[in-house]
């Protein structure tokens, strides 16, 4: 998949807010519990970064008793740099086991993992003329395609959107855009309160020192572009494309946070904040309906402080919808499967498991 294969996953995970075709369906021997389904990606065709439009989703369907009448779907959004492709290996087996365990306890859930990466690793699951329309791709293409494929048209309450890190942000942000499409959100260590989670990253010297010439080479057409030599630059390029596009008349272009002299551009930062879920909730805390269930978590020792913004968001929306916050032990990317399963148990109003002894 072109640029995607060049991503250094381990470095991205360490530096970022991160975790982190076939036709029809094919069971992969590397992870027999997941199937790969190719989505045409019509809404990504002609995207300004030249990224692939056709992508695969990873789908796990648990084994169910015959009398099970309904199978709900969890649309899972991985963290920055992650995608469905990660779930065709060892990582997928752990999630498959967790979802089979939930099904065995009377919580029948199909897990769908999407691929919304771009040239720099992650789209933040947003529509932007600097990268493409990834929220529309998820809402208007992936979900309808799969519901038709499986023959299971769903009511909004049959759909749960979930994610970790940038994917947790994406789950919240997409649900805010289209609250009528989902019944619940499970957001693990989401990118909330950018002053805490994002600003320390963009204030690093390596970001301040990017020159206009370097920036131009990074955003050049695929056949001419240069790959950033530092993974943090690559991440901030992706965040900039998501949060600060120049507009539809300049596809693929975005505003940088520093001018040619390295001076902070406050108006560009304000563009970023316009997408911050905490900022959005302060303006309008009635984002979700009373029937929605919003589960937020953040690690006790989260390296990016994601638990802080999650608590703020909880307090803002709590008077108007059902919301829960859980501070999990460990760091940003620890115990993801257990944390996700606990969030889903809360959605189903079941007894909550302990996570890391808590």
For the regions a language model picked out, list residue spans one by one.
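N-terminal secretory signal peptides that target proteins for export/translocation
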Residues: 1-7
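N-terminal export leaders
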Residues: 8-13
């Amino acid at each position: 998949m072109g640029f995607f294969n060049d991503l250094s996953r381990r470095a991205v995970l360490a530096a970022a807010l991160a975790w982190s075709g076939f036709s029809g369906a094919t069971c992969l021997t590397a992870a027999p519990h997941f199937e790969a389904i190719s989505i045409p990606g019509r809404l990504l065709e002609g995207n300004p970064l030249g990224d692939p439009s056709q992508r695969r989703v990873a789908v796990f369907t648990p084994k169910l008793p015959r009398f099970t009448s309904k199978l709900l779907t969890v649309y899972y959004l991985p963290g920055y740099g992650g995608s469905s492709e990660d779930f065709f290996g060892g990582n997928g087996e752990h999630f498959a086991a967790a979802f089979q365990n939930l099904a065995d306890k009377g919580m029948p859930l199909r897990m769908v993992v999407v691929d919304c990466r771009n040239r720099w690793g992650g789209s933040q699951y947003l529509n932007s003329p600097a990268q493409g329309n990834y929220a529309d791709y998820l809402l208007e293409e992936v979900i309808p395609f799969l519901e038709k494929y499986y023959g299971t048209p769903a009511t909004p309450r049959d759909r749960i959107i979930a994610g970790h890190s940038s994917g947790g942000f994406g789950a919240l942000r997409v649900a805010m855009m289209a609250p009528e499409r989902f019944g619940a959100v499970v957001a693990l260590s989401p990118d909330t309160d950018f002053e805490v989670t994002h600003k320390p990253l963009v204030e690093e010297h390596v970001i301040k020192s990017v020159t206009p010439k370097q920036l131009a080479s990074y955003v050049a057409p695929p056949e001419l572009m240069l790959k950033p030599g530092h993974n943090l630059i690559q991440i901030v390029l992706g965040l900039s494309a998501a949060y600060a596009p120049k507009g539809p008349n300049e596809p693929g272009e975005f505003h940088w946070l520093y001018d040619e002299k390295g001076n902070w551009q406050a108006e560009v930062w304000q563009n970023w904040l316009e997408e911050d879920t905490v900022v959005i909730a302060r303006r309008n805390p009635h984002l979700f309906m009373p029937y929605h269930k919003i589960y937020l978590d953040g690690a006790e020792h989260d390296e990016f402080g994601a638990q802080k913004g999650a608590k703020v968001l909880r307090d803002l929306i709590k008077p108007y919808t059902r919301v829960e916050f859980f501070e999990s032990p460990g760091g940003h990317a620890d115990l993801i499967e257990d944390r996700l399963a606990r969030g889903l148990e809360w959605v189903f109003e079941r007894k909550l498991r302990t996570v890391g002894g808590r």
